[in-house]
């Protein structure tokens, strides 16, 4: 299964095909625990997501800047949203199309970090709507490690395929 056509390389594929703004990149960080594999997910901040849990979490990800290497974008976004720098062997996953039409490129990487050290960047938005008042909210308000079965319930439905890939690849 080579989702990238003949090149077999997601970075080359994305560069060759001029990545539009409707694409983002992220990292699926995983670790091995005594209870099996766990994945690191983040919960979006802000008032819209405050009371949402199941189907609301995500891999740390964000938009790819013009002329930016997709893997570099994934690493940058991970650090911006969590405060953590991740290194290791980045394994490309097949891109997934979200309900919004956005395509998400992702890489799986084994590693570890402590969610209690989360340091997210912030976003400004008008809140309450039509109030004319801008407020700052963390882009990510929390992070956690989840066993794969629980992660599949927590993560946005359009990203479940990343966890399913990890299950198959690590059997």
Positions of PLM-derived features:
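Aromatic (phenylalanine/tyrosine) cluster motif
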Residues: 13-16
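N-terminal strand-loop-strand
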Residues: 18-58, 107
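Short, charged/polar surface micro-motifs in flexible loops or helix N-caps
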Residues: 34-36, 46-49, 65-66, 100-101, ...
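The catalytic Nudix box helix
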Residues: 58-93, 147
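Active-site-adjacent beta-strand/loop module that shapes the phosphate/pyrophosphate-binding cleft
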Residues: 95-132, 144, 166
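Charged phosphate-binding loop/patch that engages nucleotide di/tri-phosphates or the phosphate backbone
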Residues: 148-171
């Amino acid at each position: 299964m080579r989702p990238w056509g003949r090149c077999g390389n997601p970075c080359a594929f994305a560069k060759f095909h001029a990545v539009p703004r409707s694409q983002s990149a992220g990292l699926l960080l995983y670790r091995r625990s005594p209870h099996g594999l766990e994945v690191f997910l983040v919960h979006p901040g802000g008032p819209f997501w405050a009371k949402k849990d199941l189907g609301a979490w995500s891999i740390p990800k964000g938009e790819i800047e013009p002329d930016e290497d997709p893997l570099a974008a994934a690493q940058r976004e991970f650090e911006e949203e969590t405060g953590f720098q991740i290194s290791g062997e980045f394994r490309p996953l097949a891109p997934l199309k979200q309900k919004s039409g956005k395509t998400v490129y992702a890489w799986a990487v084994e590693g570890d970090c402590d969610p209690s050290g989360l340091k997210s960047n912030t976003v400004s938005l008008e809140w309450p709507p039509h109030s004319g008042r801008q407020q700052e909210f963390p882009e990510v308000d929390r992070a956690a490690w989840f066993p794969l079965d629980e992660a599949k319930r927590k993560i946005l439905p359009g990203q479940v395929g990343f966890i399913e890939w990890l299950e198959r690849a690590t059997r």
